[in-house]
From Swiss-Prot:
Organism: Mycoplasma pneumoniae (strain ATCC 29342 / M129 / Subtype 1)
Site (Interaction with DNA): 33, 160, 164, 342, 535
Zinc finger (C4-type) boundaries: 624-652, 673-702
Protein name: DNA topoisomerase 1
PROSITE patterns for this protein: TOPO_IA_1, TOPO_IA_2, TOPRIM
GO BP term, example: DNA topological change
Classification of source organism: Bacteria, Bacillati, Mycoplasmatota, Mycoplasmoidales, Mycoplasmoidaceae
Active site, renumbered: 340
Keywords: DNA-binding, Isomerase, Magnesium, Metal-binding, Repeat, Topoisomerase, Zinc, Zinc-finger
Region annotation Interaction with DNA: where it falls in the sequence: 183-188
InterPro entries: Topo_IA, Topo_IA_2, Topo_IA_AS, Topo_IA_cen, Topo_IA_cen_sub1, Topo_IA_cen_sub2, Topo_IA_cen_sub3, Topo_IA_core_domain
EC annotation from Swiss-Prot or TrEMBL: 5.6.2.1
Catalyzed reaction equations: ATP-independent breakage of single-stranded DNA, followed by passage and rejoining
Amino-acid positions noted as binding Mg(2+) in the UniProt annotation, renumbered to this chain: 9, 102
NCBIfam families: topA_bact
Length: 711
């Protein structure tokens, strides 16, 4: 019999964690949440706004006991009943019970649920422990410093769940009845509003057109020493001679760049007047400036970088980061490579900073060391850092990306390298640069060139070292130029320019925008960007969000009737209230009571005024071959594919896209998708039915294809 029982969430952690625990410790996994709120009455008691939990003894629905990775073959299917029963049996035999679920509010709530279902005699054995990384020191230190379950954190999680039910269930029912839309939600609907506002901004944008004139000087000029590194010198028009302005249409944009011609003819006319030499009449005083490295990753900044640099989806970033945290196989041994990946903190512990600085000192020298101390504050100290986590960082800075490159999967390596480099760079010295303006004159017309030099590479050194690429900055060294040097024009270039609307949101930029508005939490960033795709409210085209017609209708009605709730400020304040509940500054039941009483009235008003959208039937002009009823055009549930169906549906289920499209799925496999945990299937290719491949059954939501398997 094991004297000590450790309860965790994910079975993926078991092997990694077992390495650091004595033999008399047994680990059991909850495999996520063990209880959910009932669906009746939105899952809470309206008398006191406490959650009502389902009866776990009746929870018999089976699911895989498997983790996110691996093969289904030979694995037992479990229900929540099976899991809770097993935990209770093991708890009754243990001397000590350590509740070691994830170190956030959701993990705190799961620990409370485990505690709540235990027999009274076993509850006294329970202690709560947390660790931000699965390393020997972190785990053993947690065991030495157990605590009680934080009821404020638990209540904050209860409030979030009930709040999401209140808003999501009522609004979803309303949308489904009047718009045939799938759902609405506290955060997803605000994200949709972001997308729609950007869509309207793009549609209403009126571009401004202008022309610029740039001159390229020949570096091989008389009196110029060593030909200025033998490169042509680009100069920008800054001021036009008053005597030459007649007939020219232009604007002076001195605060930006220089002269903007309002038509091409004016630019050409001026260009034809440029004759003779361009002489240096002044060199401005050199300005020195520095650029500091970015802080170590938060969940949001990791999402943004991985989506942009690796081309991944938000869901994939979340999944691979979880693998690295829970432990990956390195030479047959499970090793956790990064700290907890759901955090909005940029803090690094003093101990970790010291080990990282020792690495920098040993590999790059003292001049590359930063003297900054990374504090627990967020960006500019504006944001409350949830639960005082650390930033995402490697568990051991001495495990470099190159050391594990051939031992772990490619995707795991790519994300680990991103995290490792960013962490080390955050503690390196600033990059130092210099900037000088060189002034030229030609027939009273004034131009300037910018001389940029890299003085000290600082933190950029590590990016060049590990990513094998230089900075994107273009450095032009014109130090050899002196006042009085004379040049001839090599080329005069006239360029048509125009302003452009703001770019459509990508998954990365939407997460960044929501995070800057203090909307959502690290655990929800993954779904915030994707849920509107799943509901058919938006589509992705070349990685950019486009709002569908259904999405526009949903946003319009929500903004019209629930504008006080579905907006940035309300959602931001709601997150703040949840933080205050977690800090024991606000009572969660009073908070919910105040919200619910007002929200119910708004729903009643909306039900009396919202317009039911009637979709005009679009008939094909021929009858159904199965039942002779008229055929009409329909749309799939997600609203993104048109097909021909019978008007007598559901009595007649004839449709033509299933008639015209062959069944591409051949068989389901006993293997899970490594990206979304759905079952893999064997399929025929679309254009060659004789060729097969293995892909995800969750297509098109997940587009994973197993490589090297086509036949």
């Amino acid at each position: 019999m094991s004297k000590n029982l450790v309860v965790i969430e994910s079975p993926n952690k078991v092997k990694t964690l077992q390495k650091y625990l004595p033999n008399d410790f047994e680990i059991v996994s909850t495999i996520g949440h063990i209880r959910e709120m009932v669906h009746k009455n939105f899952g809470f008691n309206e008398a006191d706004y406490s959650p009502v939990w389902e009866d776990w003894t009746k929870s018999k629905k089976k699911f895989s006991s498997l983790s996110f990775k691996g093969n289904l073959k030979g694995k037992k299917l479990l229900s929540k009943y099976d899991i809770i029963k097993s935990i209770k049996e093991k708890a009754s035999k243990a001397t000590n019970i350590y509740l070691a679920t994830d170190p956030d509010r959701e993990g705190e709530a799961i620990s409370w649920h485990v505690y709540d279902v235990l027999d009274e005699k076993d509850k006294s054995k329970c202690q709560r422990i947390t660790f931000n990384e699965i390393t020997k020191n972190a785990v053993l230190d947690a065991l030495k410093n157990p605590r009680e379950i934080d009821q404020s954190w638990v209540q904050s999680q209860f409030a979030r769940q009930i709040l999401d039910r209140m808003i999501g269930f009522r609004l979803s029912r309303l949308l489904n009845n009047y718009l045939s839309a799938k759902s609405a939600g506290r955060v997803q609907s605000v994200a949709l509003r972001f997308l729609e506002e950007r869509e309207q901004e793009i549609r209403s944008f009126v571009p401004r057109f202008w022309w610029t004139l740039d001159v390229l000087l020949n570096p091989k000029a008389e009196g110029v020493r060593e030909a200025c590194a033998n490169r042509s010198i680009p100069i920008v028009l800054r001021e036009i001679n008053p005597a030459l302005r007649a007939g020219l249409k232009f604007e002076e944009e001195k605060s930006v760049s220089g002269i903007d011609f309002l038509d091409e003819a004016s630019a050409k006319k001026f260009g034809e007047q440029l004759k003779g030499v361009f002489e240096v009449y002044n060199i401005d005083e050199t300005k020195h400036y520095s650029s500091s490295p970015n802080s170590a990753y938060t969940t949001a900044s990791l999402q943004k970088d991985a989506i942009n640099k690796l081309g991944w989806s938000s869901k994939k970033v979340t999944l691979i980061a979880q693998h690295l945290y829970e432990g990956v196989s390195i030479n047959g041994e499970q090793t956790a490579l990064i700290s907890y990946p759901r955090t909005d903190s940029t803090r690094l512990s003093a101990q970790f900073q010291q080990s990282c600085k020792e690495y920098i000192l040993n590999h790059y020298g003292e001049k590359y060391l930063s003297n900054r101390i990374v504090s627990a504050k967020g960006k500019k100290g504006e944001k409350i850092i949830q639960d005082a986590h650390e930033a995402i960082h490697p568990t051991d800075i001495n495990i470099t990306p190159e050391m594990v490159k051939n031992a772990i999967k490619k995707d795991e390596f790519l994300l680990y390298r991103l995290i490792w480099i960013r962490t080390v760079a955050s503690l390196m010295a600033d990059c130092k640069k210099s900037h000088t303006h060189i002034r030229f004159i030609n027939d009273g017309n004034k131009f300037y060139a910018s001389s940029k030099s890299l003085v000290f590479d600082g933190y950029r050194k590590i990016y060049e070292h590990f990513e094998n690429k230089e900075s994107n900055d273009l450095y032009i060294d014109l130090d050899k130029i002196r006042v009085g040097d004379r040049f001839m024009a090599k080329d005069i270039k006239i360029t048509a320019r125009q302003t452009h609307p703001a770019a459509r949101y990508t998954q990365a930029s939407l997460i960044e925008a929501l995070e800057k508005s203090n909307i959502g939490r690290p655990s929800t960033y993954n779904t915030m960007a994707s849920v509107n795709l799943d509901r058919g409210y938006a589509s992705l085209n070349k990685h950019a969000f486009h709002v569908t017609q259904l999405g526009e209708q949903v946003n319009e009605e929500l903004s019209k009737h629930f504008g006080k709730i579905i907006n940035k400020e309300f959602t931001k304040n709601m997150e703040k209230s949840l933080d205050e509940i977690a800090e024991n500054k606000k009572n969660y039941q009073e908070f919910l009571r105040d919200f619910w009483s007002n929200f119910k009235e708004e729903v009643k008003l909306a039900e009396g005024s919202i317009q039911r959208v009637k979709k005009e039937k679009e008939f094909v002009g021929r009858d159904c071959p199965s039942c002779a009823s008229p055929l009409l055009y329909r749309y799939t549930k997600r609203g993104n594919e048109k097909f021909v169906g019978c008007s007598n549906f559901p009595n007649c289920k004839y449709n033509e896209f299933s008639q015209n499209k062959p069944n591409l799925t051949l068989e389901k496999l006993e293997e899970l998708c490594p990206e979304c945990n759905s079952q893999l299937v064997k399929r025929r290719t679309k254009f060659n039915p004789n060729k097969t491949f293995v892909g995800c059954s969750n297509f098109p939501r997940c587009r994973y294809i197993k490589k090297d398997n086509a036949s």
